[in-house]
Amino acid sequence: TSYSAKECLEQLTDNGIFTPLQTQEDEFRKDNGFQKPYSTVQGEIGLFLTDAFNCIWKIADAYRKKELPLEKALSDKVLKAILHYGNIELGRPNDGPRFHASCFAIPTAAVNIYYAYLAQMEGAEIGQGRALLRGVCDMLKALGLQAWTQPLRHDETDENVVSISRFRNHVWWVGGNALAYRSLLPVAAMYRSIPMIDLLAEVCQRGISMTSQNTYSEAFWTEGFTADGAGWGHGKQCLIWGYPIDGTSNALSILNLLKGTPWSKALNRDNAEAILNFLRGGSWYYYKGYRLPCLDRGSYVYNPMEQSIPYAKMLDNIVTNWIDSFTPEEQKELQQLQVEVKKNRINMNNYVLGVYNGTRWFFNNDDLIKKTSDYHITVNMASVRCDGLESAVNMADEYNFYPTDGLTLFQ
């Protein structure tokens, strides 16, 4: 939110309602709008509730930073706001989509509010404090749990969300949608749940793997790094950037946090090979500071200035925190790649043709690429085996150029 913590406090009525959101709430209540299962209205409600919880989070964070005294930051009207907007969120129907706000934004705000008031929340958990505070503690934990429960899959995993099958074979629960945008580890810690952290550590390690046309049904995830060095997102969509990187990058970040704990895991050989294979293969889809078209949710994005290859930050994490998981020769390769990535010129000329330069066919996406220091040619072949690109409303192209129907790009 653009409002300051002080402004957010001033906007709260004694009943815990933000005055800038009052008119919108009244409109939703007309004709029982909060219970309508339609995606359009539920999407609007999700944004409305996200605004409310982000304002509460701003107040809580100001207390954490010692910018607000406790008597203001945890006043009755703040507690009532958590309960008011929380009850709206928990009362929404599950027969319509409950994505983005319900599984990403609101649980993230809730768990951060909980930790901002950690001392008070821990007291409430053992029965201390006012009934209003104890109710707020329960509400924040219920909202945070939605990172693990929403959206419903309408299968057996809804009865046991702490299961490996919960995080497989569904676009909402694999790759970036599984690990990058959900506050899974903070919520697991909030619940002090050993089974949750056990599961999360396993999902992170098994998710750093490869899929392919031939192993689609058996692979741990149905998207991410492909066996030829490219990537998929949302099933077989040829999204080299975005989802494949988000899933693995955040798996590595979570495993970073688990180092030095009973859940600490070393990368195994399969993990290392999957990472190195993608770093090599992904470099073919980037040339002298520019991403190629038709590889992300924005089909034809043009950047007038050079940019780093999208996996640059993930590579930095690997070199800094996971270099020991690779052989001495691979370590030298990763360090050289890191140097060249920072220059936006990935040549790696001391490696044989076909690794970073030359001609290469990416069979999972049906891409034929010729890459030299002088020119770059991509033949994106007509392919019934791929699904094109994401065209989601408000967050992608909203249309599709059908980039798997065959085109040739010369750079």
Q: Could you describe each region identified by the protein language model?
A:
Residues 3, 9-298:
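Aromatic-lined, polymer-binding surfaces characteristic
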Residues 5, 40, 178, 357-359, ...:
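Short, well-ordered helical secondary-structure segments
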Residues 247, 254-411:
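Extended polysaccharide-engagement surfaces of secreted carbohydrate-active enzymes
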